[in-house]
Structure formats: structure tokens, C-alpha cells
């Protein structure tokens, strides 16, 4: 698809005078456009849900999740991947981000890196194995590096998902599931770090959060596999046990200590009325799902 025919490369009529208006009007124009992003993402919810189920299925079977992209899209993938271990207690290699140009490109643009199909295919081939799932991210849907990476992932037996802002793109064609929120032209023509990037971030939030919920790393709306690696998070762990069980802070803190800091284990112990060891055994039998572990610990 020619660049000038892409939705994301169009010229927004509402911002033609943005260089002449007051600062308040300037940010109002940007804000008005941003309001459209969530609505565009809403239209893609069925596809997002399919992708969540696909990712969870692969992860449950021992696969891993890879995000791949260039520029802003690549950085968003790395950002999302980096938050998974501390938030959900996942192994650091469970969700990984791959960016055109390597890690240096996270901080400084590597001109031309996105144009190499060969490097895109090579970067993915060096990392993935059959059973993994690869999410290609590109506003245009035509970035050579990302398209080639997704095509190579599919060839190697990975499940593939496309996150793009231009439907009917080469990236979408290489995906088992295509997610394409159409946010329209940017306030600054072609600056896809704006609405397109915001839409991508929202989609990635749903993909990773949804997958972690399906893997049992959330109980109610609590991140019960969180790694309490600092004082703030240790206090949060106590609060989560209090909120999940209705016990006071002293009881929650004791249960956490007996559970070796495991929020899940403390919750199961308190709600099932069992000791920490029994709670751990129930969680192991339940595959880490708190509700099922409580049922098993109670002998139901």
C-alpha cells in the first residue's frame, strides 16, 4: 500500500490552523482527537478477546509472548513486556520485546533499521520456537522489519497477532488475529506516536492483562502474583490480603510471613482456614488459580 494512501498518513482538517491558535486551543484540539481513540479500540474488542485467548492458550502450554516493532511501536512492546515480571510475578523471559535496531533504538532512533526485512526475520528466528506467540506492532501495517518478523514467526510455527492502525495491511495478512483500531489522521500529519501509539498501548494493556488474568495471576481484581520487591509493594501485599480476606493487617502480615511473602498463599490459607503448607499444595494442584485452590483446600 502506498504511503499517501494510508489512513495514518492523512491530513487532519481540524488541526490545519494549530500553529496559529492559542496554547489552550492547541491542547483542546489534541484532546478532542484523543477522545476518539478509546472508541476506535472498542470496535476491535472481539478481535482483542480472540488474541487474549490465543496468547493465554500458548502461554499455558509453555509458550512465550513476543512483541516486535520499530520506533514507537517497538518501544511500546518493550514497555509492556518489562512490566509483566514485577506486576504478575512472571519469569522475565515469558513476555519479551524486540525492537528494530536493538536496545539502543529504545533511547535513540536508529534510522533505516525498520526497512530491513532480513533483520526482522533474523531477529525473530533467533528468539522464538514453535508454540510461542508473536505480536507484530506497526501503525502503518507495512513496516518491512515488522512484517518480515511476523511472517517468519508464522513460518516457524508461532501463533501471530497484528496490532496496526491501517486495516487490510501486509501485517494483518501475516496474522492469525488482526487488531486494527482506525484512529484516523494525526493532529500532526504522520506523527503516529500520538493517536496511533495511544491505541496500540491500550491494546497491549488488554492483551497482557487479559492473558495474565486467564493464567490465574489475578484474584478478583488483585495482582496476587505481584513480586513485593520494595517497601511500597510489601505494604500493598498486606493490603491485598486484607482486602481479599477481610482480616486485619496483623493477621494478614502474619499469614504473608508464614507464606514466604506469597499473596496467593496467604489468601488461600486465610480463606480456607488451613496452614501455609496446605495452601501451597492446594495452589499447586489448582495450577495457581486461587478460587480453585480454596475449594480444594476446603476439601470440596
Swiss-Prot record:
The keyword Lyase applies. It catalyses: N-acetyl-D-muramate 6-phosphate + H2O = N-acetyl-D-glucosamine 6-phosphate + (R)-lactate. One of its GO terms (biological process) is peptidoglycan turnover. PROSITE patterns: GCKR, SIS. Keywords: Carbohydrate metabolism, Lyase. It is an enzyme of class 4 (lyase). Residues 55-217 form the SIS domain. Disulfide bonds: none annotated. Pathway: Amino-sugar metabolism; N-acetylmuramate degradation. Transmembrane segments: none annotated. The active site is at 83 (proton donor), 114. Gene3D superfamilies: 1.10.8.1080, Glucose-6-phosphate isomerase like protein, domain 1. Its EC number is 4.2.1.126. One of its GO terms (molecular function) is ether hydrolase activity. PANTHER family: GLUCOKINASE REGULATORY PROTEIN (PTHR10088:SF4). Specifically catalyzes the cleavage of the D-lactyl ether substituent of MurNAc 6-phosphate, producing GlcNAc 6-phosphate and D-lactate. Homodimer. Belongs to the GCKR-like family. MurNAc-6-P etherase subfamily. A lyase-type mechanism (elimination/hydration) is suggested for the cleavage of the lactyl ether bond of MurNAc 6-phosphate, with the formation of an alpha,beta-unsaturated aldehyde intermediate with (E)-stereochemistry, followed by the syn addition of water to give product. This is N-acetylmuramic acid 6-phosphate etherase. It comes from Symbiobacterium thermophilum (strain DSM 24528 / JCM 14929 / IAM 14863 / T). The lineage of its organism: Bacteria, Bacillati, Bacillota, Clostridia, Eubacteriales. The gene is murQ.
Amino acid at each position: 500500500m502506498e504511503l499517501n494512501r494510508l489512513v495514518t498518513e492523512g491530513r487532519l482538517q481540524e488541526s490545519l490552523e494549530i500553529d496559529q491558535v492559542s496554547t489552550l486551543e492547541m491542547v483542546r484540539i489534541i484532546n478532542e482527537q484523543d477522545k476518539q481513540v478509546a472508541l476506535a479500540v472498542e470496535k476491535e474488542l472481539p478481535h482483542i478477546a480472540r488474541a487474549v485467548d490465543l496468547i493465554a492458550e500458548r502461554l499455558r502450554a509453555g509458550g512465550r509472548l513476543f512483541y516486535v516493532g520499530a520506533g514507537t511501536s517497538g518501544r511500546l512492546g518493550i514497555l509492556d513486556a518489562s512490566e509483566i515480571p514485577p506486576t504478575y510475578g512472571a519469569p522475565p523471559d515469558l513476555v519479551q520485546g524486540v525492537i528494530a535496531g536493538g536496545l539502543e533504538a529504545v533511547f535513540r532512533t536508529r534510522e533505516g533499521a525498520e526497512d530491513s526485512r532480513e533483520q526482522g526475520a533474523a531477529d525473530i528466528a533467533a528468539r522464538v520456537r514453535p508454540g510461542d506467540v508473536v505480536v507484530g506492532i506497526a501503525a502503518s501495517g507495512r513496516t518491512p522489519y515488522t512484517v518480515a518478523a511476523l511472517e517468519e514467526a508464522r513460518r516457524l510455527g508461532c501463533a501471530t497477532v497484528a496490532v496496526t492502525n491501517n486495516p487490510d495491511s501486509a501485517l494483518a495478512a501475516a496474522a492469525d488475529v488482526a487488531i486494527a483500531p482506525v484512529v484516523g489522521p494525526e493532529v500532526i500529519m504522520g506523527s503516529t506516536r500520538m493517536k496511533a501509539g495511544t491505541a496500540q498501548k491500550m491494546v497491549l494493556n488488554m492483551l497482557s492483562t487479559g492473558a495474565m488474568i486467564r493464567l490465574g495471576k489475578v484474584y478478583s481484581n488483585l495482582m496476587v502474583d505481584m513480586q513485593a520487591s520494595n517497601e511500597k509493594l510489601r505494604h500493598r501485599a498486606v493490603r491485598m490480603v486484607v482486602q481479599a480476606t477481610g482480616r486485619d493487617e496483623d493477621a494478614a502480615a502474619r499469614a504473608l510471613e508464614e507464606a514466604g511473602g506469597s499473596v496467593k498463599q496467604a489468601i488461600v490459607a486465610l480463606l480456607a482456614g488451613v496452614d501455609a503448607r496446605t495452601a501451597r499444595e492446594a495452589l499447586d494442584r489448582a495450577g495457581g488459580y486461587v478460587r480453585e485452590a480454596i475449594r480444594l483446600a476446603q476439601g470440596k
